[in-house]
């Protein structure tokens, strides 16, 4: 119940439908009942379409909110927007800077994860997240909710789903598969460019969203990965070694 798979005939239709989720969420927002969306970097093709739709419709976003899902961490703090892979930079350049200033939400309504996670976590209170969008990584993550390292108390078995679901926004060490994927998709194959840590939204915030929406155009995880997580979610087969299955 509550889980469905939607197929699109063309990439154009796919990314337009993804962009419309932003618009549909923001249309519900009012000053008394603000509404937002939590969105990914990967995919990104929808972002310029979002800006174009907002401008064409003349949709005021003054009360609307946006949460970034994650950001790179350089070992000391979040990377700046000068970093070539900065997610905040991508969101702003591909979407928000393209929205007419008269329509754009105030900067205080844009929430990007930082090394000090408290302001980001607090921003989820009092605002409705209509939808959390995401992609699926090779390691079966959403955001950077990778499988936890198999060491210490998790050496012989991964954490129980109920334990993993307690995790909130946090700084994480990234799985080697995630590093390789981002080098391939974003770094031109240069794995040394990819930070080994990140700040990610957690299951705690994910479960505050009214809906979780995962978009897969075939450029990130493999067909096998898509079929695997679809099967696990539809059958209620939950295992924290496959983080996407926790969405069941």
Language-model segment annotations:
Residues 1-37, 55-56:
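N-terminal glycine-/serine-/threonine-rich phosphate-binding loop
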Residues 1-6, 59-133, 192-193:
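Ligand-binding beta-strand-loop-alpha-helix segment within the catalytic cores
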Residues 37-47, 135-141, 219-221:
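Gly/Ser/Thr-rich loops at beta-strand to alpha-helix junctions
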Residues 50-61, 83, 146-158:
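A glycine- and small-aliphatic-rich helix-loop capping segment at beta-alpha/alpha-beta transitions
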Residues 143-195:
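Class I SAM-dependent methyltransferase SAM-binding "motif I" and its flanking Rossmann-like core
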């Amino acid at each position: 119940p509550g889980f469905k798979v939607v197929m699109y005939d063309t990439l154009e239709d796919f990314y337009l439908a993804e962009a419309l989720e932003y618009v549909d969420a923001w249309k519900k927002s009012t000053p008394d009942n603000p509404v937002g969306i939590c969105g990914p970097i990967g995919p990104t093709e929808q972002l310029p379409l979002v800006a174009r739709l907002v401008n064409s419709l003349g949709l005021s976003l003054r009360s609307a909110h946006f949460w970034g899902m994650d950001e790179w961490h350089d070992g000391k703090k979040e990377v700046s927007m000068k970093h070539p892979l900065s997610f905040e930079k991508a969101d702003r350049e591909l979407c928000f800077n393209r929205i007419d200033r008269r329509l754009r939400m105030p900067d205080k309504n844009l929430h990007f994860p930082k090394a000090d996670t408290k302001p980001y976590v607090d921003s989820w209170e009092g605002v409705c997240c209509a939808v959390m969008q995401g992609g699926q990584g090779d390691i079966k993550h959403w955001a950077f909710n990778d499988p936890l390292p198999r060491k210490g108390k998790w050496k012989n078995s991964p954490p129980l789903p109920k334990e993993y679901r307690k995790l909130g926004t946090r700084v994480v060490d990234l799985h080697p598969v995630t590093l390789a994927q981002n080098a391939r998709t974003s770094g031109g194959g240069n794995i040394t460019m990819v930070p080994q840590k990140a700040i990610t939204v957690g299951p705690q915030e994910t479960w505050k969203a009214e809906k979780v929406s995962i978009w897969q155009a075939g450029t990130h995880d493999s067909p096998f990965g898509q079929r695997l997580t679809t099967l696990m979610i539809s059958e209620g087969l939950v295992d924290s070694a496959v983080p996407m299955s926790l969405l069941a």
